[in-house]
Each structure stands twice: as C-alpha cells, then as structure tokens.
C-alpha cells in the first residue's frame, strides 16, 4: 500500500480518446490496485456517467466535476475543485494507490497543476492530422507520456505514422510516447508499464 495515492492526469483535445483510455486503465488495473477516478466536464458529468455505465469501477469510486466554461482552469490555475474531489476520494477509500484525473476537453496549451498531478499523460489522435505533433504546445512537448491514439484511422485520413513518429521524437526531445488503438488495446500495456515504473507503483 502506498502512503499517498499516485495521481495521474490524463489530458488532451475533445474526442482524442481520454475517456476510452481511462476506462481501459480502470478495467486493467482495478484488480491490482486500490483505484479511483476524477473526471472533468464543462457542464455535465457525461464522462463520469460513461465510466459508471461501462462498469469501470464501483460508482462511488468515480467523481464527476463540472468545471464551467474553462476546463483548463480547473486543472491548472485553480485546481481547488479537483483537489477537493481527490481529498473526498482519499477520505472515502483510505489506502488508495492510484487516482486518475481526466481533464475536460482542452487545447494544446493546457497543463496540469503539479499540486494536482504527479504524472501527466497527454492524448492526441491521428484523425486530427499528422501535422499535430509538430504544432507543439505543453501537452505534446512536456507531458510525461504522450499517447498518439486511433492509429487505425491513419489510412482513412491520409496520415503518415512515420512522419508523426519522427516529428514527435524531435518535439519531445527523448521523452516517451506511445502509439495506441484503444479499440484493440494496442499500446495499453506500454502505458500501464510507464505508469507503474514512473509512479513507483507496487501492486497489493
């Protein structure tokens, strides 16, 4: 059991696959770790409801936060609403190992406050085009792990994974990244290995 839970922030643009990744991580890790989730949505609790419907975790382990019009503010400049949700989960489930904090759909400049997140995973998707990595921004360049999702769509949108690979290496300067397809689970094992290694997680 870890003294304080590892908090992993999962960010990225709307539709990139953040919630699908959060669901996949819950299903893969819930037997190994004492786990909970905070989701951020602008005006609803849609992502939290999705996780509950798909039985990611018991409903009481998932808190949906409504951020209002600026989802990036709730994870960066004023993270108090998220920190309160994390505190609530810690009180509800003593001995938590891991809390996933999924941001609302944000732009390429959004980052997590260090107060809120120990590790950050930023999710982009191939359907946004193969030029996306070279556009940079803190999420692409500075996140602890970049996930390039929906690689199955590359042929459909004319995106070059080779170009994305070389651009991402250049933009991230050696920081890790993973190509993934959440529909098939491709890349998930690498993402989990990163979380466990970097977060010093030890299963109960």
Swiss-Prot record:
GO biological process, one term: urea catabolic process
Major localisation: cytoplasm
An MF annotation (GO) of this entry: GTPase activity
Pfam families noted in UniProt: cobW
This protein's UniProt keywords: Chaperone, Cytoplasm, GTP-binding, Nickel insertion, Nucleotide-binding
Gene Ontology cellular-component annotations: cytoplasm
Binding-site list for GTP: 12-19
Keyword Ribosomal protein: no
Domain of life (superkingdom): Bacteria
InterPro entries recorded: CobW/HypB/UreG_nucleotide-bd, P-loop_NTPase, UreG
Subcellular localization: Cytoplasm
Family statement: Belongs to the SIMIBI class G3E GTPase family. UreG subfamily.
Subunit structure: Homodimer. UreD, UreF and UreG form a complex that acts as a GTP-hydrolysis-dependent molecular chaperone, activating the urease apoprotein by helping to assemble the nickel containing metallocenter of UreC. The UreE protein probably delivers the nickel.
Described function: Facilitates the functional incorporation of the urease nickel metallocenter. This process requires GTP hydrolysis, probably effectuated by UreG.
PANTHER family according to UniProt: UREASE ACCESSORY PROTEIN G (PTHR31715:SF0)
Protein name (record): Urease accessory protein UreG
Organism: Pseudomonas fluorescens (strain ATCC BAA-477 / NRRL B-23932 / Pf-5)
């Amino acid at each position: 059991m870890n003294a304080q839970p590892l908090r992993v922030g999962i960010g990225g643009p709307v539709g990139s696959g953040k919630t699908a990744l959060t669901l996949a991580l819950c299903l893969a890790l819930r037997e190994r770790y004492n786990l909970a989730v905070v989701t951020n949505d602008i005006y609803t609790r849609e992502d939290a409801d999705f996780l509950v419907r798909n039985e990611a975790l018991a409903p009481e382990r998932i808190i949906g936060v409504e951020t209002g019009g600026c989802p990036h503010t709730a994870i960066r400049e004023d993270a108090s609403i998220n920190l309160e949700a994390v505190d609530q989960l810690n009180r509800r489930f003593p001995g938590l190992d891991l809390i996933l904090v999924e941001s609302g759909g944000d732009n390429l400049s959004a980052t997590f406050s260090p107060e809120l997140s120990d590790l950050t995973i930023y999710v982009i998707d191939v359907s946004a085009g193969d030029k996306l990595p070279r556009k940079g921004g803190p999420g692409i360049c500075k996140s602890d792990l970049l996930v390039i999702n929906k690689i199955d769509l590359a042929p459909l949108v004319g995106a070059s994974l080779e170009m994305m690979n070389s651009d991402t290496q250049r933009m991230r300067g050696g920081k890790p990244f993973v190509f993934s397809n959440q529909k098939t689970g491709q890349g998930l094992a690498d993402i989990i290995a990163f979380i466990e290694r970097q977060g010093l997680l030890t299963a109960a």
